[in-house]
Amino acid sequence: TLDIIFTAEDEVLNGFAVPANYTIIWVDQNDAALWTGDEKWLRTVLAHELQHLVYFNTVKGPWWLPEPMNSLVHGTPTWIVEGIAEYFTEEWRPFRYELSHRYHVLRNTVHKIQDPHNDGYSKSLYLADRFGDSTISKILNHRNKLKFLDFKESFKKHTGITLKQFNEDWRRQMNTFYFSQ
């Protein structure tokens, strides 16, 4: 079962999900509604947080490893966690991603992007475009002999390149795109 908790407490910006199969979502309208465009803010946040729950259930370690350790051993970068939630539930929007992303690319500071949603979404789009949508699923569902997801190993197996090389290829692609405009 998945538990969804709606709250009016102002301690939560939008919402968050945890590996224990629950999500907490703030129902009061906030500044984040400005970047959702025509999409209803609550629908956007709910879809995003539910995607996190799908992710957590996909990457869990073997049944014999107790919580929370079975959720912490895979080494998945935060940009994947947030990026695929954005990729599967949202659209690239000017106020949500484009302006910040363009700013960092043009100033050669993509390595300083603080929010893993921004570069994560961009990297997820690039990953899917270059290797296909199904590669994301293959990477996250791959298990080694011990029945663990080793993200770096799985990434290389299903893309043919290392994460480091992927990040460099992505950076070059972003430079080519933004500097050619």
Identify the residue ranges that each predicted region occupies.
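Soluble non-cytosolic domains of exported or imported proteins
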Residues: 36-45, 75-79, 114-118, 130, ...
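Post-HExxH zinc-binding segment in Zn-dependent metallohydrolases
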Residues: 58, 66-110, 157-170
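Long, well-structured alpha-helical subdomains associated
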Residues: 94-143
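Juxtacatalytic substrate-recognition/specificity segment
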Residues: 1-69, 150
